[in-house]
Design a protein with these regions (language model features):
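Class I Rossmann-like S-adenosyl-L-methionine
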Residues: 1-132
Length: 132
């Protein structure tokens, strides 16, 4: 589990997905854990919940989009970068109320801060998300 306290809805969703992948955590338990630790408004709590469950429910579709816009095989993408890309693609392709520039910028910030990615990987993610 990530020990850092999440500050945004997207961080809550990302931390939930990271915990599921890395620790085998159950989605509802991890989500409630991070929602309890975050000091979010009810609207942001709802967004975090929608993003986390939306990515979980649409992982295959998010990966399909990722394959269409990336030349890199999914198996070559670091797990946290992959999760962040799924989160960004979900926001871009499957939600209608999140502005594209916000989805791209916030996803790139998540990758930079929590995926331990170098600038080349950050640039790759930025390019893929802008193409979606």
């Amino acid at each position: 589990m990530i020990k850092k306290r999440p500050h945004t809805a997207r961080e809550v969703a990302a931390f939930t997905l990271f915990s599921m992948e890395e620790d085998g955590a159950w989605s509802d338990g991890a989500l409630h854990h991070y929602l309890d630790r975050a000091d979010l408004a009810p609207r942001d709590r709802a967004l975090a919940t929608r993003l986390a469950y939306g990515v979980i429910q649409n992982r295959l579709l998010c990966d399909w989009y990722l394959r269409q816009f990336s030349k890199v095989r999914l198996s070559k993408i670091a797990p946290r970068v992959h999760i962040c890309l799924q989160l960004g693609i979900y926001q871009l392709a499957l939600t209608d109320r999140i502005p594209a520039h916000a989805a791209v910028a916030e996803t790139v910030t998540l990758i930079r801060n929590y995926a331990h990615a170098n600038e080349r990987t950050v640039g790759f993610a930025n390019g893929v998300l802008r193409a979606v």
